[in-house]
Structures are given as C-alpha cells and as structure tokens.
C-alpha cells in the first residue's frame, strides 16, 4: 500500500502529489493539518523525525524529504517516466530538482513573513514555547519563533527575495527552447520548480510577470490536468485551513 502524508497545497506536498497524479499512481491520502500541528504529534514524528510534510509510506516503510520521495517514486513506478532518458537532459532535470530543494528556505521565509506571521503572532506565549519545544529541526524552530515574535527584518526578506529572483532568472533562461525545462519531455524538474515559481507569483507577481518566457511556462504548467487537480483548494486533499488558533494537543 502507498500512503502519502501531506498538507495539501504546501510547496513540497504539491510536488509529490502532482507527480503521483501525472503518473497515475494510486495512493491513500493522509492529510496532516499543520495549523493544528499534527506534524508534531508523536505518531507522525515516529515516521518523520523532522516533523515536516510530506512523508511517503510504502508497505509500512516511511520515505522522507520530497526530493528523495520523488526519486523513489520514479524508481518504483518507472512508467510513465518523468526522468529524461538522455543523460544530459536527465542531469538538467536533476539540477532543477536540487535547486528547488535548495531555495526552499528562502521561499519559506517570505511565505512566513507574508502569510503565517500574522497568525502566529496571535498565539499565546505559553503555546508558542510548547510548539517550539516539539520542533526537532533548529532552523524551522527559529523561523517559527521569529514569525511568532519580532518577525523578519526588512534585510532578511530582501535577501530572500534576491536569492529567489536569481533562481527565477536562471530558470527562465533554462526554459529555451522549451516548452519544458528539458525540452519536449515534461519532467520532475518542471514539477519541482512549479511549486517554487507558483508561490513566488502568488506573493510577488512581478517576479514572474516581467519574464515572458517564465510566465508562458507557468501558464502551460497550470493548464495541465494534474496541476489543476493538485493545486485546487477546498478539496478533500486540500481543505481550507481552520479558522482561529488551535491549541497544541498534549503529548502522549
């Protein structure tokens, strides 16, 4: 049995969900509500010690890290392939998969600053401390504490956007001749970068709009049936976030 523990339209969750839909691989969806911190409950941490989504569980064996999960899916379910056959094209696909993974911390910072911080600042101090105490990854713990406290400085956000803008520029250049980053074949590189580019467009539209080649690629990507399925909100796999502040459940 293939089970995917995910949180709907979070960046890394979308990458793996889209891949599975593109390939037509059936899976059992296990939604993890991050806003009620289900990812920090003992049962989830036993599967994923980092306390992040997604986690793929195949016949009882957990696979973590979205990049590793996507490679695993291609290894176990090779058809239809989302990895180019040509070695040079495959290296290009892997490069952009790695870039999407490497730039994620910068994307997380601007997302927290624009979307999450307002909510986190309303959480009482005792709950903030309890949540932070359960977060195993130091960088993520620091990001959460900053978003619930003094927030991110203008320099922090400017630096994150500078990194993101650099990546968007490089990716736009790599899309020629197109239509996809590895040419005619749609690949994991496109899937991984779509989650990054789409989030940048949502938070700062001009970063994509001023790059016509990138904007055209994004429009083509969003027209794919698997993307429309994966990126839709208000669905069983991507329900709307709960309103208000949900208390952290007591540890078992």
PLM regions with names:
Residues 19, 29-31, 35-38, 42-43, ...:
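Mixed-charge, polar/low-complexity N-terminal
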Residues 42-45, 80-81, 155, 178-180, ...:
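Flexible, active-site-adjacent loop/turn segments at secondary-structure boundaries
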């Amino acid at each position: 049995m293939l089970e995917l523990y995910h949180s709907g339209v979070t960046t890394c969750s979308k990458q793996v969900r889209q891949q599975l839909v593109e390939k037509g691989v059936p899976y059992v969806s296990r939604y993890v509500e991050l806003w009620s911190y289900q990812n920090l409950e003992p049962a989830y941490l036993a599967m994923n010690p980092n306390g992040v989504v997604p986690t793929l569980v195949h016949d009882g064996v957990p696979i973590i890290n979205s990049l590793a999960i996507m490679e695993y899916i291609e290894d176990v379910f090779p058809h239809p392939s989302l990895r180019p056959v040509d070695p040079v094209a495959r290296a290009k696909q892997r490069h952009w998969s790695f870039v999407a993974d490497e730039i994620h911390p910068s994307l997380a910072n601007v997302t927290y600053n624009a979307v999450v911080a307002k909510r986190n600042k309303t959480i009482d101090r005792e709950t903030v401390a309890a949540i932070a105490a359960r977060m195993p990854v130091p960088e993520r713990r620091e990001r959460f504490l900053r978003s619930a406290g003094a927030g991110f400085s203008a320099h922090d956000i400017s630096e994150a956007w500078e990194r993101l803008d650099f990546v968007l520029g490089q990716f736009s250049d790599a899309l020629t001749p197109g239509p996809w980053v590895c040419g005619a074949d749609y690949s994991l590189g496109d899937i991984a970068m779509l989650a990054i580019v789409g989030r940048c467009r949502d938070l700062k539209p001009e970063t994509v709009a001023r790059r016509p080649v990138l904007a055209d690629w994004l429009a083509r990507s969003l027209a794919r049936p698997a993307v429309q399925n994966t990126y839709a909100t208000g669905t069983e796999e991507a329900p709307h976030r709960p309103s208000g502040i949900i208390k952290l459940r007591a540890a078992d």
